C-alpha cells in the first residue's frame, strides 16, 4: 500500500526546473503603473523594431522589449527603483542631464545605465548595433 501511495504521489508531483520567471507581461503602460507605481516612456519604434512588449516585476521594474519580426527579443529598456551597476570595462559620459555609464565593444555600445535620482535606467541593445549618437538620441527619449 505504501508503495502505491508513493507512486501516486510521484506521478502527481509537478517538477519545476529553474527559478520561476518574475516578469509579468502586461498590455499597457497603465497596467504597468498599477503594478509598480511608475511608468516607462520609450519610443514607439527603435531601429528596425516595429513591435514591443511590456513586462513588469511587481513593485520593482518596468521593462520594454522591442521585438524582431520573428517575435524574438531585441533591444531591452528597463526602469527600476534604486541603482544598477555595470561591473566591467565602462566609461562615464554626459548625455543631457545624466551621467551615463556605458560598456562598449568596438564602436558599438553594448550596455548603458543612468539614474535620474529616483529611478535607474538600463538599455541593453541585445545585439542591436547602436553607435554613440544613436544611443544618446535613444536615452534622451526615455523617461
Located regions from the model:
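Short, solvent-exposed recognition patches
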Residues: 20-110, 115-116
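Bacterial Sec-dependent signal peptides at the C-terminal "C-region" and cleavage site
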Residues: 12-22
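Surface-exposed amphipathic alpha-helical segments
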Residues: 125-143
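Sec-dependent N-terminal signal peptides
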Residues: 4-13
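Short, exposed beta-strand-loop hairpins at the edges of beta-sheets
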Residues: 113-116, 120-131
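Polybasic, low-complexity association/targeting segments
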Residues: 3-4, 21
Amino acid at each position: 500500500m505504501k508503495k502505491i501511495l508513493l507512486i501516486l504521489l510521484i506521478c502527481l508531483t509537478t517538477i519545476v526546473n529553474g527559478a520561476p520567471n518574475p516578469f509579468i507581461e502586461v498590455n499597457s503602460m497603465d497596467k504597468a503603473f498599477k503594478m509598480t507605481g511608475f511608468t516607462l516612456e520609450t519610443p514607439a519604434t527603435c531601429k528596425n523594431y516595429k513591435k514591443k512588449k511590456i513586462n513588469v516585476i511587481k513593485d520593482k521594474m518596468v521593462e520594454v522589449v522591442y521585438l524582431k519580426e520573428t517575435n524574438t527579443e531585441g533591444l531591452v529598456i528597463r526602469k527600476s527603483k534604486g541603482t544598477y551597476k555595470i561591473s566591467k570595462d565602462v566609461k562615464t559620459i554626459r548625455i543631457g542631464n545624466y551621467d551615463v555609464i556605458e560598456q562598449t565593444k568596438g564602436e558599438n555600445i553594448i550596455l548603458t545605465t543612468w539614474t535620474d535620482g529616483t529611478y535607474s535606467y538600463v538599455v541593453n541593445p541585445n545585439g542591436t548595433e547602436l553607435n554613440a549618437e544613436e544611443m544618446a538620441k535613444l536615452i534622451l527619449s526615455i523617461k
